[in-house]
Regions:
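Residue-level recognition of beta-strand termini and adjacent short loop/turns
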Residues: 113-115
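Extended lipid/amphipathic-ligand handling interfaces
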Residues: 109
Length: 136
């Protein structure tokens, strides 16, 4: 077999895997918003790439003792976007981390329908119900 063809075979074998990675990222790429009483309480912006990247902005998530969302305190809204770290996609789920001062928060964003997702804070000090996000 000619050398060119031999060298090309491994590249061709990787194409389906690259296409799968791109398709998985497309599920998540875009701007996602969580709302409470028609007000945006958190925005997640994700960009497809190698690896997927993004940031959270304006997130003010407050819950009651049952883990249900409650009215956010307007003074709690952070001004600057926070970059996400260690993003990993597995099927319909994106896990990522975000630094909050000295703390590292761990998140899981799961696509549950067309333009619909649920966010879980994996290491929250209080139990939280999934937070609904819609792609903008």
């Amino acid at each position: 077999m000619p050398r060119f063809v031999t060298a090309l075979l491994p590249l061709l074998a990787c194409l389906p895997l690259m296409a799968q990675a791109t398709d998985a990222q497309k599920k998540f790429a875009g701007t996602w918003e969580a709302k409470f009483k028609d007000k945006v309480i958190c925005t997640i912006r994700l960009k497809a790439g190698d690896p997927i990247s993004g940031e959270t902005a304006g997130c003010s998530i407050n819950v009651d003792e049952n883990g249900d969302l409650k009215e956010p305190d307007s003074a709690d809204r952070p001004d600057d976007p926070s970059p996400i770290f260690n993003p990993k996609i597995h099927d319909d789920t994106l896990t990522f981390e975000e630094k909050d001062g000295d703390e590292v928060l761990k998140f899981e964003l799961k696509v549950v329908g067309d333009g619909q997702a649920e966010l879980r804070i994996l290491n929250s000090p209080v139990p939280l119900k999934p937070i609904h996000f819609a792609r903008k």
